[in-house]
């Protein structure tokens, strides 16, 4: 971490005092630069090309050194378009890796991979910056306690609990509620844990990034009137950007999150959407650098690159970074090297189901497909584990009976199976819940449900104590007391 004397970035004059080289070759987003003998920059150093193109337009391109080629030449990858660059242009070695602004000044703002604001709200306080390349915390700094990260979302906390400082894979297609779930998690961590969030948009659509920003402003996660009260910082490296930017934007977001964890000692949520695009960008850069491709055309350094990002996401004695990563699975092939390498790092998976979304059950988290390594009696306790297993068994039996119901109808089932179906339908509805960030759209107030309340509610449904209540009473409520109150209201309306 570096504390700069002024609030502005390094000026051109101070940069020009440093080491100077010249462009020898340009291959798309890759530059070869010649430096004087004995003045070679280090790997990962940031290089800056400043000047004017043939029509007099200002050029300012930042690159990152990737290879030392010999004969005083280095190969660097550009973080922005290389249009207008020519051979012989001056290149300044900054003498350090890319550094980005960190701290409270980043909240409510949108940054690019270089840590420059791109939201038209003026400059950001850059007195405190941090390099994007850092080693993972040492073993002695790690917090090895296995503790659950309570989200206040019933289906997640009960059936696929998140680990504090863990990594969660979020699987879901378009239109099943990924964005709303992400925003609710950002909102809940701010309210319940006093934490902040960092969102890294890696190689996804610019339109989606814009939609997310607008929805965050609408729901209050980003407070336009008082930016400092916002709960999230956004870092975007979208699909239209060069592979260098898409490969490094995840590290920029992670660096901002690390500051909140290590210096502010907060619990941080780090969202990466999409981790597959990080691998994809690495694959493009690898080919541009002339490395031999590995399995399915991916880079030979796939595991190393993934590990260097994932190992920095962890709990230390100061605070925690809990990461939720959207995972795109190419051609639905889970054995593809990119998702397969990602799975090795995940502690839990949250799978969103189009079938549940079609039924109007939100959050549309699939209770049978979502998994967590935390769901063990020694970690969550016997009561939680037993309740979760019984909920899953009931839902699984309901799933098995659905074909019979579709062909023969409910009446052909045994008494026991009919009871199972009735309870499963109540459970399915009770797994839905109104979200704070959806209040503006639905008009119903959001609910945060603590874990003990969640367990109690499902125990009451499973025990049969609530068999007499209509299943509609369990739909979009918070805790079980609200469901019983809703049932009484429904009764009153009938009379």
Curated annotation (Swiss-Prot):
Q: How does it sit in the membrane?
A: Peripheral membrane protein
Q: Predominant location of this chain? A: plastid
Which Gene3D superfamilies does this UniProt record tie to the protein? 2.40.10.170, Bovine Mitochondrial F1-atpase, Atp Synthase Beta Chain, Chain D, domain 3, P-loop containing nucleotide triphosphate hydrolases
Q: Which reaction does it catalyse?
A: ATP + H2O + 4 H(+)(in) = ADP + phosphate + 5 H(+)(out)
Concerning InterPro entries, the annotation shows: AAA+_ATPase, ATP-synt_VA_C, ATP_synth_F1_bsu, ATPase_a/bsu_AS, ATPase_alpha/beta_chains, ATPase_F1/V1/A1_a/bsu_N, ATPase_F1/V1/A1_a/bsu_N_sf, ATPase_F1/V1/A1_a/bsu_nucl-bd
Question: Mitochondrion as a keyword?
Answer: no
MF annotations from Gene Ontology: ATP binding; ATP hydrolysis activity; proton-transporting ATP synthase activity, rotational mechanism
Q: Which UniProt keywords apply?
A: ATP synthesis, ATP-binding, CF(1), Chloroplast, Hydrogen ion transport, Ion transport, Membrane, Nucleotide-binding, Plastid, Thylakoid, Translocase, Transport
The compartments listed are: Plastid, Chloroplast thylakoid membrane
Q: Choose any GO biological process term that the UniProt entry carries and state it.
A: proton motive force-driven mitochondrial ATP synthesis
Q: What does this protein do?
A: Produces ATP from ADP in the presence of a proton gradient across the membrane. The catalytic sites are hosted primarily by the beta subunits.
> Which NCBIfam families does this UniProt record tie to the protein?
atpD
Q: How does it assemble?
A: F-type ATPases have 2 components, CF(1) - the catalytic core - and CF(0) - the membrane proton channel. CF(1) has five subunits: alpha(3), beta(3), gamma(1), delta(1), epsilon(1). CF(0) has four main subunits: a(1), b(1), b'(1) and c(9-12).
Identify this protein by name: ATP synthase subunit beta, chloroplastic
């Amino acid at each position: 971490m570096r504390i700069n004397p002024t609030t502005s970035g390094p000026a051109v004059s101070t940069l020009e005092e440093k080491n100077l080289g010249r462009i020898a070759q340009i291959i798309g987003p890759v530059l070869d630069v010649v430096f004087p003998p004995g003045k070679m920059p280090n790997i990962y150093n940031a290089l800056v090309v400043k000047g004017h193109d043939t029509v007099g337009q200002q050029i300012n391109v930042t690159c990152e050194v990737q290879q030392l080629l010999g004969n005083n030449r280095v190969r660097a990858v550009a973080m922005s378009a290389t249009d207008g660059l020519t051979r012989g242009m001056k290149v300044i070695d900054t003498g350090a890796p890319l550094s980005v602004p960190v701290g409270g000044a980043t909240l409510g703002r949108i940054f690019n991979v270089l840590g420059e604001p791109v939201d038209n709200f003026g400059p950001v306080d850059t007195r405190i910056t941090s390099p994007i390349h850092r080693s993972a915390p040492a073993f002695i700094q790690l917090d090895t306690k296995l503790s659950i990260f309570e989200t206040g979302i019933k289906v997640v906390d009960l059936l696929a609990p998140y680990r504090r400082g863990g990594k969660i894979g979020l699987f879901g297609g378009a239109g099943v509620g990924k964005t709303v779930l992400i925003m609710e998690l950002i909102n809940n961590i701010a309210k319940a844990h006093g934490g902040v969030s960092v969102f890294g948009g890696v190689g996804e659509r610019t339109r989606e990034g814009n939609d997310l920003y607008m929805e965050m402003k609408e729901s209050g996660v980003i407070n336009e009137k008082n930016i400092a009260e916002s709960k999230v910082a956004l870092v975007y490296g979208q699909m239209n950007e060069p592979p260098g930017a898409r490969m490094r934007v995840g590290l920029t977001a992670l660096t901002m999150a690390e500051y909140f964890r290590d210096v502010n000692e907060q619990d941080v949520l780090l969202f990466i959407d999409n981790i597959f695009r990080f691998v994809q960008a690495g694959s493009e850069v690898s080919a541009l650098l002339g490395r031999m491709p590995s399995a399915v055309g991916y880079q030979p350094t796939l595991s190393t690159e993934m590990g260097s990002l994932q190992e920095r996401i962890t709990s230390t004695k100061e605070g925690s970074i809990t990461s939720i990563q959207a995972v795109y699975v190419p051609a639905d092939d889970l054995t593809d090297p990119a998702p397969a390498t990602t799975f090795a790092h995940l502690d839990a998976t949250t799978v969103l189901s189009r079938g549940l979304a079609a039924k109007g059950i939100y959050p549309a988290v699939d209770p049978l497909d979502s998994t967590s390594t935390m769901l063990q009696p020694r970690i969550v306790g016997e009561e939680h584990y037993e309740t979760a297993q019984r909920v899953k068994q009931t839902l699984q039996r309901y799933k098995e009976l659905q074909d019979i119901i579709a062909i023969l109808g409910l009446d052909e089932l045994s008494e026991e199976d009919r009871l199972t179906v009735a309870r499963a339908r109540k459970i399915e509805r009770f797994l839905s819940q109104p979200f704070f960030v959806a209040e503006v759209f639905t008009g119903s107030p959001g609910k945060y449900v603590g874990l003990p309340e969640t367990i109690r509610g499902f125990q009451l449904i499973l025990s049969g104590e609530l068999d007499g209540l209509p299943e509609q009473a369990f739909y979009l409520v918070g805790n079980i007391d609200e469901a019983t109150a809703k049932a009484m209201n429904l009764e009153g309306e009938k009379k």
